[in-house]
Amino acid sequence: MYALFLLASLLGAALAGPVLGLKECTRGSAVWCQNVKTASDCGAVKHCLQTVWNKPTVKSLPCDICKDVVTAAGDMLKDNATEEEILVYLEKTCDWLPKPNMSASCKEIVDSYLPVILDIIKGEMSRPGEVCSALNLCESLQKHLAELNHQKQLESNKIPELDMTEVVAPFMANIPLLLYPQDGPRSKPQPKDNGDVCQDCIQMVTDIQTAVRTNSTFVQALVEHVKEECDRLGPGMADICKNYISQYSEIAIQMMMHMQPKEICALVGFCDEVKEMPMQTLVPAKVASKNVIPALELVEPIKKHEVPAKSDVYCEVCEFLVKEVTKLIDNNKTEKEILDAFDKMCSKLPKSLSEECQEVVDTYGSSILSILLEEVSPELVCSMLHLCSGTRLPALTVHVTQPKDGGFCEVCKKLVGYLDRNLEKNSTKQEILAALEKGCSFLPDPYQKQCDQFVAEYEPVLIEILVEVMDPSFVCLKIGACPSAHKPLLGTEKCIWGPSYWCQNTETAAQCNAVEHCKRHVWN
């Protein structure tokens, strides 16, 4: 795609390179039609006028000035003005251009190629835009829009939602012709051999996807190889083929990495069409907590992990810490300075609360900071950590296979880190789900299989948490993928654990005097 930016640059950039030789002139109109200089050196002025320079252009100051000048120069030719007079007029016009390097380049090309320019003006008096495109002072509208689209993708960290068929199909549909050119117009397509062609295609696409992930130079080599195949299409089609590959190869490869090999092969006709599978219905949070996360292996009886609400003491301590951390953040303190200040915060509380404060700091200190740095409202932090009841999030009860020694911890952090970098704040559950399904393919090979297992096991509970916060350490600790350095804080009475305990059944609800609460907020 960098070639497109170079081809769309103005006159100064066009003159920066050496004089074209025979080898460069064999590369087609992408090289010939950069400007009058390259077209003249390659003997392709007429071709460029008929196929490239006659396309719509972008409205700009250099382009408008150029059109006025060309029109005036045409009138001067009608009045039998000499070449010297027109040269002086054109050079004076170059001085009007806004940038010094553009003005100098304009004068150089006018001095060197005046006869060619005059011939173009004589033949295209009614279309000054074509002459200005030849001078590279009017930019192609098609190239300009392509650059804007590419720049927009670079500036956004959101995973694009593109129409796969619209983007990939034209590029991929040409692959059979490139790899297996036809001998003549009467040749017949080769028949498929009982699905062998489909399997070969799937294997080829799989190998390509693997190579793209593991070999940084493979993509460029692949594009160059396909361009070489374009030469087999003959002089007329070869240039069109190469230009097409240059324009669409990058986005086609990007989309190919998001598709299954069989989908791609069906798209280009090597495999039967893949039937669409309906997406699995998302289960509400309160239902997702029971028997929806499959165990990967048989293990000893699994204990039920609950995140209980804490007593009022822990709630008050948490709210105090949140206020202190918020003040430090507002004063532009660094993360390290804030973490170092946690112990001093506890000294501000009465001695009767120092032990509880230290427990909260040790267990939840980094999580409090991470959540606040995500610009979450301070009033919600302690509820999210289940240290305060009331408006807190419903506790999630999950049954998971315990990985040995935190086996999923590293892959969890890498995946959540990927989501944090590529998803915008306030992303919907659907956007998070789509990103989860694609995220594993972007991790290094050693993590991909483990990542797929991790997503299959943790997906429901992971989505619920990612809607609120995307800090890798906090999320992976919260869902149990990473082991905690401290035991969670528990109250002395089970009823202070909150709704996660109250609403287990009618007996516990009655025991904690919470039947009405459970009916309104949990059992409905």
Swiss-Prot record:
The lysosomal precursor is proteolytically processed to 4 small peptides, which are similar to each other and are sphingolipid hydrolase activator proteins. Residues 17-59, 143-194, 275-310, 393-404, 487-524 form a propeptide. Residues 18-58, 488-524 form the Saposin A-type domain. It comes from the Eukaryota. The record marks 215 as: Not glycosylated. Changing residue 241 to S: In MLDSAPB; severe. One of its GO terms (molecular function) is protease binding. Keywords: Disease variant, Disulfide bond, Gangliosidosis, Gaucher disease, Glycoprotein, Leukodystrophy, Lipid metabolism, Lysosome, Metachromatic leukodystrophy, Neurodegeneration, Parkinson disease, Parkinsonism, Repeat, Secreted, Signal, Sphingolipid metabolism. Changing residue 453 to P: In PARK24; associated with disease susceptibility; affects the intracellular trafficking, resulting in endoplasmic reticulum retention; cells carrying this variant show accumulation of autophagic vacuoles, impaired autophagic flux and alpha-synuclein/SNCA aggregation. Coiled coil: none annotated. GO terms for biological process: adenylate cyclase-inhibiting G protein-coupled receptor signaling pathway; epithelial cell differentiation involved in prostate gland development; ganglioside GM1 transport to membrane; lysosomal transport; positive regulation of beta-galactosidase activity; prostate gland growth; regulation of autophagy; regulation of lipid metabolic process. GO terms for cellular component: azurophil granule membrane; collagen-containing extracellular matrix; extracellular exosome; extracellular region; extracellular space; intracellular membrane-bounded organelle; late endosome; lysosomal lumen. InterPro entries: SAP_A, SapB_1, SapB_2, Saposin, Saposin-like, Saposin_chordata, SaposinB_dom, Sphingo_Act-Surfact_Prot. Residues 59-142, 194-275, 311-392, 405-486 form the Saposin B-type domain. Glycans are attached at residues 80, 101, 215, 332, 426. Disulfide bonds join 63-138, 66-132, 94-106, 198-271, 201-265, 230-241, 315-388, 318-382, 346-357, 409-482, 412-476, 440-451. SMART domains: SAPA, SapB. Residues 1-16 form the signal peptide. It is found in: Lysosome. Saposin-B co-purifies with 1 molecule of phosphatidylethanolamine. Saposin-A and saposin-C stimulate the hydrolysis of glucosylceramide by beta-glucosylceramidase (EC 3.2.1.45) and galactosylceramide by beta-galactosylceramidase (EC 3.2.1.46). Saposin-C apparently acts by combining with the enzyme and acidic lipid to form an activated complex, rather than by solubilizing the substrate. It is linked to Combined saposin deficiency: An autosomal recessive storage disorder characterized by hepatosplenomegaly and severe neurologic disease, due to absence of all saposins. PSAPD has a fatal outcome in infancy. Metachromatic leukodystrophy due to saposin B deficiency: A form of metachromatic leukodystrophy biochemically characterized by tissue accumulation of cerebroside-3-sulfate, saposin B deficiency, and normal arylsulfatase A activity. Clinical manifestations include periventricular white matter abnormalities, demyelination, and peripheral neuropathy. Additional neurological features include dysarthria, ataxic gait, psychomotor regression, seizures, cognitive decline and spastic quadriparesis. Saposin-B is a homodimer. Prosaposin exists as a roughly half-half mixture of monomers and disulfide-linked dimers. Monomeric prosaposin interacts (via C-terminus) with sortilin/SORT1, the interaction is required for targeting to lysosomes. Interacts with GRN; facilitates lysosomal delivery of progranulin from the extracellular space and the biosynthetic pathway. This is Prosaposin. It comes from Homo sapiens (Human). The lineage of its organism: Eukaryota, Metazoa, Chordata, Craniata, Vertebrata.
